[in-house]
Each structure stands twice: as structure tokens, then as C-alpha cells.
Amino acid sequence: MYLFVKSLLFIVFFILIFTFQKQAWPDHKRECKCLKRLQPRIPTDSVRLLTRTIFKLLSQTESDQEELYSIAEHQSHLADMSEEKKEGLGHLCTTLQVYLGEENGDLSQLPPGLDPISLLARVTCNCFSISDGELQDVGVGLYLSMSLLNHDCQPNCVMIFEGKRLTLRAVRLIRPCEELTISYTDILATSKERRSHLQKQYHFLCQCTRCTTEDKDCDMLAGEKMAWTSLRDVIPHLKQLQSEQRWEDLLKESQALLHRYTDVVPDRNIYVLRLLDLAMDASISLDDYKTALEYGNRALEPYKLYYSDPHPSRAVELLRVGKLQHYMGRLEEAQGSFTQAYDIMKVPHGTDHVLTNERPSTAVPPRPHTPLLRFFDMLAVNQHAMCLPPAFVPLCIKPAGLEFN
């Protein structure tokens, strides 16, 4: 399943596309009724996704039932959940019943063992955040085959989205019979934080090498403990400012904290690094590209330390810095940043991903998702004699990896 974001009645909701929009119309129409029924409240992502899953289950054809894996074969982990979490699921089920309204009677037609709370638990444990080429979340979805992959904090594969397609790509050599793994959590966190998140969300204790050896934890928590503890505690407030798009307040507070602790907590401390990212985002949103570039440059070395190549997060950070350098006319620096970003991206994204390969035919200013080769074209024009090395010639080959449509 894959989801796209659309709007109706000023509410954001997800529409599941099966093959063509015409085929999805019956479920689209049912969901419109549900959204109207719940106004002015907005259902959570998990309730919306569960509703789409229920519609899918109720309309299953025989060919659908022959799919490789079904939601019933995935773990719900209900027995492992705390009473508090079960109570939360119960509240969501109540919301679901109100949301479904007259459609609620159809729940009795669900396959055996798939009651609403069990389904909700399966959805929350097995769904993925859908991201764009620059790793910004744009939705949630169920990819049932992908959900069977286990976690490792140093995985041998990454997942890359391109529109409706999710591609699993190897990021290092994989030995015969070696298990394919992905990361369920952001690795920009200490071993304790990663383990806590994985235990709470997915109900297992991570025993990977990176967690058991506490690899890089000393760097992540470098500096005076009292200082970085203060930074850690204020970050949720700053993220709230970011979600509310209060950019001036976010930049002002982030800058004050970075200035206050600059001598006692280094940039490689993960809480300073998160501050740098927040300050960079605020500066870009306020069109203060000079300040944004300053923070972006400071973040490059810590990103290199924690996101070993070819990690897409480091490539995206290099891409952001390169764009800022390009905007400011620092073309040689931009060329270097784009070259590094491309060398990384061609592994996890592939050389035919839209972010690395597409060449728009019209001369337009660079947008947030302008493909890398487009930037190289513009740099070549601006510097008159700059030629692309052979590595940047677009290759019309299918990316290595397993694609799940």
C-alpha cells in the first residue's frame, strides 16, 4: 500500500492508490464521508491508515488474498504492551468507531482474529514514514513485505522512496545468506536513547554491535554534562516552535543557546548538532542564507562522524549546503559539495533516481528538490568552461535493489 496526501474540506487526509485513481474512487468516497462526520476534529495518522487498511481488507478479491504476505501474518505485540499503551489504543479505537460511523457495521466482516484493536496494533508496529528524496516525511504507509526486515543500527540496506515506489538498496557488500537489515530509528541518538525507543515502539532490546559497544556515545555526549543536559531538555520546545513555523522565535532562541554553550559543548555533541539543524531550517525559512550556510557548514563534520558513507542523511546535508553555496554565488564550493553529495547518493538513491538524474529542460531557479545534475548544468553555465567529469553522465540503468510497488 502507498499513500498520497490530498486535502478536502480544509482537512489533510491520505488517499490510498491501488493502481489508478478511478479504481480507488469507491474508497475515496467512503473516506470523504468519514472526514465530514468527524469535523472539526482531525483523525490521527494511525486512524486514517487503519481505515484505509480496513477498506482494503473488506474489498479483497481472491487475487489480493494470494499476495506474498498479509497484515494478519504480522506481529501486533499486544501481549508485550504496557497497560498505558493498551489504553491509548483503546481510545484510538473509540475514535475509529466514531470516524467510521455507518461503515462501522462492516467491521464484523473482517477476517477472523483481525478485530480493530489488533489491527491498530499491527498498523502502528509495522507502518513506515514515507519520505521524499530529501528525507522529509510526507506520509505514512504499509509495505507488508518490507515490514519483515529486521533492525540493525548499522544496517546493510536503506529504504528510498520515489513517489509511490519504495526501493530497498544495499549500502555495502552483502555476503551469501547474510540477513538483510534496515534501521527502524534515527542513528543520531545515543545507544540508551535508541534502545529505549526501539523497546517502546517495537518491543525488543537491540543487541547490535553499535548498541552493545556504545559506539560513538562518548562523542555524542561530549562537553560539560550540565550544559548539554540543558540543551537536551529544551529541544522539544524548539521543535514545537518549528512545527508551528515560528521561525523568528526559533532562530533567536537557537542562536542564544549556541552562543551560550559554544565554549563548553562541541559541535559533535548530538544536542548541539540538532540545534544547528533547527537554526539552519529557521534561517532558510527567513531567507537568511548566509546564516543558514554558517550553521550548515558547522554541521558537516559531525554528520560525517555519525553518518558513515554512503548514508543518505549525510548526502542530503551536503546537498543543502551546496544549494546555499550556489545561491550565494560560491560556485567552486558548491561544485565540491554537490560532487560529494552525488558520490554518496548514487549508492542509496541510484543513478536514475529523480533527485540525482533528472534534467529539467527549462531554465528555472533551483527548487528544494532540484536534481543534482541540474545543479551541475547550472554550474557549468555559470563558470563557462566547467565540464562534468564522466561520473556525472546520467546512466540509464535500473538501480540495484529490491523494489516493492
Describe every region a protein language model picked out.
Residues 384:
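Cationic, low-complexity basic patches in intrinsically disordered or flexible, solvent-exposed regions
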